[in-house]
């Protein structure tokens, strides 16, 4: 289970970068939910890890393309084909972006009310967040945001132990494991998933997007 979760986390963390590894346009079946509640069904064109957070390019069934700013959208999602080595076939994985207020703009002088990818949903939500850098080696920096009780907190390799221990304090058996083997930074999705399963109402299943 740990190996699977680690692989799943790695896929989601690298998705936004690897999907732009070449110049081919990446278009996927999906939908956009506008701020007025209207849902548009069609295709979503990927732009870049950071531009996907500040706007979304939607293509209607008639081929007309419209770019919506984050201020106009509450959420969007699309089906991303993930290769399953066990079946040697592709399985659609739902990628979901929702609007949240963050502390850092993804692009210079950009908005801080943006659309970010929700990787884990439940009592604690986990979001992947990308921001542009000035580094010649890495164009984008990846961090997380975690959310509990509608409070968004930025989380990185340096502060994850403090933040997660506080968020899972009502599950002491898990709290003491944070930062230990199998519960390090690369396992934050698994740790949050375990906590969400512990706190979920009986019979409910809250977890990673699939």
Regions found by a protein language model. Give the residues of each.
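Exposed beta-strand and adjacent loop surfaces of beta-rich binding modules
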Residues: 16, 29, 53-55
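Short, solvent-exposed mixed-charge patches
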Residues: 22, 208-210
């Amino acid at each position: 289970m740990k190996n699977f979760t680690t692989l799943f986390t790695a896929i989601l963390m690298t998705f936004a970068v690897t999907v732009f590894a070449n110049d081919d346009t990446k278009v996927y079946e999906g939908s956009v939910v506008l701020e007025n509640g209207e849902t548009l069904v069609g295709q979503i064109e990927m732009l870049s890890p950071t531009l996907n957070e500040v706007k979304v390019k939607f293509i209607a069934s008639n081929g007309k393309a419209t770019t919506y700013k984050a201020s106009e959208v509450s959420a969007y999602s699309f089906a991303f084909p993930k290769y399953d080595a066990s079946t040697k076939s592709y399985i659609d994985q739902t990628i979901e972006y929702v609007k949240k207020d963050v502390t850092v703009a993804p692009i210079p002088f950009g908005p801080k009310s943006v659309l970010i990818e929700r990787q884990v949903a439940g009592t604690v939500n986990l979001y992947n967040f990308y921001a542009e850098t000035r580094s010649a080696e890495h164009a984008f920096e990846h961090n997380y945001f975690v959310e509990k009780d509608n409070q968004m907190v930025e989380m990185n390799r340096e502060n994850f132990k403090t933040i997660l221990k506080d968020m899972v304090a009502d599950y002491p058996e898990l709290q003491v494991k944070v930062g230990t083997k199998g519960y390090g930074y690369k396992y934050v999705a698994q740790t949050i998933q375990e906590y969400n399963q512990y706190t979920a109402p009986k019979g409910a299943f809250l977890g990673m997007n699939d």
